[in-house]
Amino acid sequence: MKLRDRPQVRLDLLFTLCRLHREGIAARITRDLVPTRPELLEIVRWEQRATREAGPLLDAHGWLGPDLVGEVGAEAAWWVILLCDKHRLFQQNAHRLLQEAVDQGAAPARHLAYLTDRLLMHDGEPQLYGTQYILNADGSIVRHPVAVPGLLGLRRHRVGLPRSDEARPADLHLMPLTRGPLGAASVSFIG
C-alpha cells in the first residue's frame, strides 16, 4: 500500500485516545503493588471519564481501529476499553464492535482474546486464552482459571499470542490493577 492510498487518520480521535491512555496509566501508578483506597478511587474516576469520552466515539464510529485512529490510537482504544471494568455494558458493546472488526480483518484477534477473557473473568467464568491474572491482597499473582487447559496453546496460537509456558514473571505487566472476581484486583499478561 502506498502512502497516498492509506486512509486519513482522525487526529482528534487519536489525541483523545492517547490522552485517556496516558491518564489511565497515571491513575494506575500506585505506591504499592496493591492500590490503597484513594488510589482505587482515582482509578474509578478515570474509568468514568474514559467511558464518558470513549463511549460516544464507539457509538459514532464503531470499533476505533487502525484505519480510523492509526496503530497507536487502536492500541490506546483497546487498552482503555479493556480497563473500564466497572462499566460492563460499555465493555460488552465494545466487545461486539471488536468482534465485527476482527471478523472483517480490521483489528487484531489478540485484542479480542484479551477483552473476551476479561469479560469472562468478571463473570466468574474460566477464561479461554489465559490472558488474565488475579492480584491478591497479599501481592501474589495467579492466573485466572482457564477453560480446558489442554487447548490453551492452540487457542493462543490462533489469535497470535505466544505459548503460555513462555511467560516469565517479568512478562507480567501490572496494567489493569482493577477488580477481579469477588473484588480482587486483576492484572493482565502482555504477550
PLM ranges: what are they?
Residues M1-G124:
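N-terminal helix-rich structural modules
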Residues L98-R158, P162, D171:
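An amphipathic alpha-helical core segment
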Residues M1, V142, V146-P149, L154, ...:
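An N-terminal structural lobe/cap that precedes and organizes the functional/catalytic core
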Residues L40, N136-G139, P181-L182:
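A short, structure-level motif marking secondary-structure boundaries and short turns
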Residues L83-F90, Q127-T131, G183-V187:
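Short, charged low-complexity intrinsically disordered segments located at boundaries
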Residues G65-A74, R158, P162-A170:
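A surface-exposed partner-binding patch
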